[in-house]
């Protein structure tokens, strides 16, 4: 009953839930069916921000003022809540960056220093001077959102698409073959969708993550489409130090109910 009450509270707090919109047939009640793209705002979250956060808002780069200290505490509380929600531990970090999953992938690319300035690269052909065996390689799945594909293709890395199996999932046999084919590359990264934002097919992340780690590859998971609907475990509950624990996850919180206005979270 507690969960039912919570769901009812969320549903009844959606801003615009009873809103009408003019159309060719006159005003009609809005039926929102695009949660794959974005969630909608919740009244109790917006009320809390207006009444409890904004009156004390200040720059989080300083704690020398009371308002700066309070705003910084809010931010750090948010980090802790998110870390707990994804079963993170002291080895994991929560970052806030950019817009949605696009901002998170972009941040990881910058951290790994995988991108050259476009204008300089076009003028001097720096990427072409990197021999193939020295290039990083990125393995992606058959149904990636553009944020988990296009950004990787704009780096110095080679992007390898792993085809799907008969069930529409990442084909583990093909993934193993590709990992062996590129075994000598200096940096190997697997970046796969936890769920397709087109078909809704959910990937079993454990065997894919385990296979990536068995071949010394970093395991990244795009939970943009899946996060509002499935549990997320950064560290496998049965073996936190085991091969099924994830290295990086990408979350797009604006897809959650109450999420509009939030940053991406890697």
Identify the meaning behind each predicted range.
Residues 1-266:
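Pyridoxal 5′-phosphate
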């Amino acid at each position: 009953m507690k969960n039912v009450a919570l769901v009812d509270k969320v549903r009844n707090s959606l801003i615009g839930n009873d809103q009408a919109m003019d159309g060719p047939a006159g005003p009609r009640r809005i039926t929102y069916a695009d949660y794959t793209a974005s969630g909608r705002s919740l009244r109790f979250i917006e009320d809390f921000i207006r009444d409890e956060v904004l009156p004390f808002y200040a720059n989080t780069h300083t704690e020398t003022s009371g308002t700066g200290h309070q705003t910084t505490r809010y931010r750090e509380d948010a980090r802790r809540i998110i870390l707990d929600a994804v079963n993170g531990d002291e080895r994991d970090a929560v970052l806030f960056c950019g817009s949605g999953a696009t901002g998170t992938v972009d941040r990881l690319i910058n951290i790994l220093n995988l991108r050259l300035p476009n204008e300089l690269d076009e003028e001097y052909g720096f990427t072409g001077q990197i021999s193939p065996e020295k290039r990083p390689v990125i393995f992606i799945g058959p149904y990636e959102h553009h944020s988990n594909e296009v950004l990787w293709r704009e780096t110095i890395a080679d992007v390898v698409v792993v085809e799907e199996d008969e069930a529409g999932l990442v084909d583990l046999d093909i993934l193993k073959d590709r990992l062996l084919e590129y075994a000598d590359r200096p940096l190997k990264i697997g970046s796969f969708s936890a769920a397709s934002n087109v078909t809704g097919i959910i990937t079993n992340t454990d065997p894919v993550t385990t296979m990536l780690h068995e071949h010394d590859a970093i395991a990244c998971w795009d939970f943009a489409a899946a996060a509002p609907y499935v549990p997320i475990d950064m560290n496998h509950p049965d073996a936190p130090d085991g091969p099924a624990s994830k290295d990086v996850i990408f979350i797009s919180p604006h897809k959650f109910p109450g999420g509009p206005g939030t940053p991406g979270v890697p």
